[in-house]
Swiss-Prot record:
The gene is fadI. The active site is at C99 (acyl-thioester intermediate), H392 (proton acceptor), C422 (proton acceptor). Pathway: Lipid metabolism; fatty acid beta-oxidation. This is 3-ketoacyl-CoA thiolase. It is an enzyme of class 2 (transferase).
Length: 436
């Protein structure tokens, strides 16, 4: 068992999530087409500061993340500081932990507070799959470097003669793991087959996610945590996530064909998250600083954990490894939790993790534990839907989940919630938050 964790400052202050906000999430090449992640990040952070009356000189540190990196803005956090009018001396750095990026940025702010160097911070993440770095072939890249060393026209022509027409074609961002060559979708297919997750089960989970997300939007639950976005050419606003199916019908999911294993597969575009654009952020303070400034926190971080596993098989099983560590560090069991949200990269991955949470065999063979983490009560699980419905701008999902969980716990009268996510590279994240 992991040692119990104390997420407090040296003076005993808890680490507070004071507020959270996100843009609506939009499918790739729709509303935010042409809007880079740095602009999405500036948009949401500026609105967060204005909406909650935060004087910009209060902010000691910004930690922000991005997965689809743009070479022209490698430190998105610093660009957000400079682009929102914060004090130029505000410390800012960027992080990347694939789909768990904004869990990492939140933890980094928390750990700075625990160390006593920060009292007010902003964490979050943004991604745009609509504005991606388009590369060139290795041969062309090498030729362009060599051209800089040439002096004569003849030398330049000799370099160009080495190139074929294929070398001149643009190279889109890779969708496969660098270490294995496998895509996330291929891993989801492997997990579906290995853990016997049927197509029907996957479609049912996707339908459930869309239905609960639609209900949450219609009930007004998300209106306070999702800003209205205005993007160029400013002809229309976006107020809601445009991936949510407000008319979801289970029978419609069966019509789609598998994407990653066309003959024997079960993972489709409907039971997986789409490529998405969006940004999110949370305002964090030490408990005493929040009280001093007159803020009532949404809640507090109780524990957190990260895990890393093999990438060749079950690469998206990170939640099953990280969660028991976070529970131990909180001194809790799965049954103690009020709510649970697990990031839905794919329905297959989500359901495989749900199975492993309840598996004594998995606990003994993979975790070295005597018994399973526990069987998830589905009445507590992803009660507002999750990423299959809302979408998944990679770096923005973690702080989307934190804000959404704390607001829902407060609506229910308080309690504790588990947030957990898989991530590329065989990574996993888990965080337990609590409200008064």
């Amino acid at each position: 068992m992991a040692t119990k964790q104390s997420v407090t400052t040296r003076e005993g202050d808890r680490i507070a999530i004071v507020a959270g906000l996100r843009t609506p999430f939009a499918k790739m090449a729709t509303y935010f087409h042409g809007v880079p992640a740095v602009d999405l990040g500036k948009m949401v952070v500026n609105e967060l500061l204005v909406r909650h009356g935060v004087q910009k000189e209060w902010v000691d540190q910004v930690v922000y993340g991005q997965v689809v990196q743009m070479p022209e803005a490698p430190n998105i956090a610093r660009e957000i500081v400079l682009g929102t009018g914060m004090n130029v001396h505000t410390d800012a750095y960027s992080v990347s932990r694939a789909c768990a990026t904004s869990f990492q940025s939140t933890v980094n702010i928390a750990e700075s507070m625990m160390a006593g160097t920060v009292q007010v911070g902003i964490a979050g993440g943004a991604d745009s799959t609509s504005v991606s770095p388009i590369g060139v072939s290795k041969n062309l890249a090498r030729a362009l470097v060599d051209l800089q060393k040439t002096k004569t026209l003849g030398q330049k022509l000799n370099i160009f003669k080495r190139l074929s027409l294929r070398d001149l074609a643009p190279v889109p961002p890779a969708v496969a793991e660098y270490s294995t060559g496998l895509s996330m979708g291929q891993t989801a297919e492997q997990m579906a087959k290995t853990h016997q997750i049927s197509r029907e089960e996957q479609d049912k989970l996707a339908h459930r996610s869309h239905s609960l997300a639609a209900e949450s939007w219609e009930a007004g639950k998300l209106s306070s945590e999702v800003m209205t976005a205005y993007a160029e050419p400013y002809k229309a606003a976006l107020e809601r996530d445009n991936n949510v199916r407000f008319d979801s019908k289970l029978e419609g999911y069966a019509k789609l064909r598998p994407v990653f294993d066309k003959k024997y597969g079960s993972v489709t575009a409907a039971n997986a998250t789409p490529l998405t654009d969006g940004a999110s952020a949370v305002l964090m303070m030490t408990e005493s600083r929040a009280k001093e400034l007159g803020y009532t926190p949404l809640g507090y971080i109780k524990s957190y954990a990260f895990a890393a596993i093999d990438v060749w098989e079950d690469m998206l099983m990170g939640p099953s490894y990280a969660t028991p560590i976070a529970l131990d560090r909180a001194g809790m069991t799965l049954n103690d939790l009020t709510l649970i949200e697990m990031h839905e990269a794919f329905a297959a991955q989500t359901l495989a993790n749900v199975k492993m949470f309840a598996s004594d065999k998995f606990a003994k063979e993979k975790l070295g534990r005597d018994k399973a983490t526990g069987e998830i009560d589905m009445d507590k699980f992803n009660v507002m839907g999750s990423s299959i419905a809302y979408g998944h701008p990679f770096a923005a999902t973690g702080t989307r989940m934190i804000t959404q969980m704390l607001n829902e716990l407060n609506r229910r009268g308080g309690g504790s919630g588990l947030l957990t996510a898989c991530a590329a590279g065989g990574l996993g994240a888990a965080m337990i938050v609590e409200t008064e």
